[in-house]
Amino acid sequence: MSHPNQNPTTGTAYLVGAGPGDPDLLTVKARRLLDEADVVLHDNLVGDDLVASIPECTTVENVGKRPGGERTPQAEINDMLVREARAGRDVVRLKGGDPTLFGRGGEEAEHLARHGVPFEFVPGVTSAIAGPSAGGIPATHRDHASALAVVTGHEDPTKPDSAIDWEALADIVSAGGTLVVLMGVGRLPDNVAALDERGVAEETPVAMVERATLPSERTVTGTLDTIVERARAAEIEPPAVTVVGEVVNVRETVANCLGGAAGETGPAVGLGPVEEEIEVNQR
C-alpha cells in the first residue's frame, strides 16, 4: 500500500552496506544497485576503489564524517535522500559495513518513511564479524565462546547516563563470551578500564584489527593489561575493531596458514624493553 504522501514518480532510496573494505566483499545486489543508481551518497569508510568503480554518469557525493574533522550533518543527509528521491532519482546511501549496525540506517529509514519515500535496506558484511575473522579470530567458537556482544566504543563509558551496560559486558567476557567493540580506538584506555574495574581478568586476550580486509590491514594482540600500550606502540588508528575474549587465542593456532593480510607478518614495533612482546602483523 502506498504512503499517503508518496508521489508516483518518486525514486527509491537504498540503504546499502558496502562491507568491511575489500571491494570483493560487496554483495551482488549492492553491486547491481551501484551500477543502476542515479545518485550515490557514500561514507568515508567506503574504499576509494569501490567509489571509483561507480559509473561515471552517476552523481557521487561523499557525505562521510571523520572523527574530529569535517562532517555532513545527519539532518542534511536525511534531507538529501528525500530531495533526490522526490526528484525521481534512485539514490544509494552507501555505508561501510552494514547500514543498520551503528550506521544510522534506522534513523534514515524513519526519516524516509515520514516523508513517504520508498526505501530498502540492503545488508552488508559487518566489520563486527569480518574484522575479527580477517585477523584470524572467529567471533564464536565451540570450545571458547557461545555468546557475542557488539557495542560502539565511541561512547564515553564514564558518563553517568551511558547507554552501554559495562557491567553486563564484563559478565559476558568473564563467562567466556566475546566482546567486539567498534569505533573504539580513541577511547581504548577508557573501555579497557571499564572492563578491568568490573572484574575482567587482566590476562584476558585482546586484539585490535586495523583496516580489516584492506591491503594495509594490521593486527595487534595482547591482553587487557597490555593492549593499550601495544596499540599505542603500533600507532593503531581508526578504523579498527577491538576483540576481547578467549577466541583471540585462536589466531595463534591458525596464523601460519591464514591467507590475506592477517597471515603475513611484518616487522615488530619497538617500545624499549617490551619490544619482544609486541607483534604487529601487516601486509
Q: How would you describe each model-predicted region?
A:
Residues 50-51, 112, 131-132, 191, ...:
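Hydrophobic packing residues within well-ordered alpha-helices of enzyme cores
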Residues 1-23, 28-125, 228:
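Class I S-adenosyl-L-methionine
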Residues 24-25, 72, 103, 129, ...:
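Residues that form or flank phosphate/diphosphate-binding pockets in enzymes
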Residues 2-4, 10-13, 87-91, 155-283:
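A contiguous loop/helix-start segment that scaffolds small-molecule binding in enzyme catalytic cores
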Residues 58-65, 119-120, 139-149, 199-208:
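Short hydrophobic/aromatic-enriched beta-strand-loop microsegments
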Residues 3, 96-175, 218-221:
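Class I SAM-dependent methyltransferase SAM-binding "motif I" and its flanking Rossmann-like core
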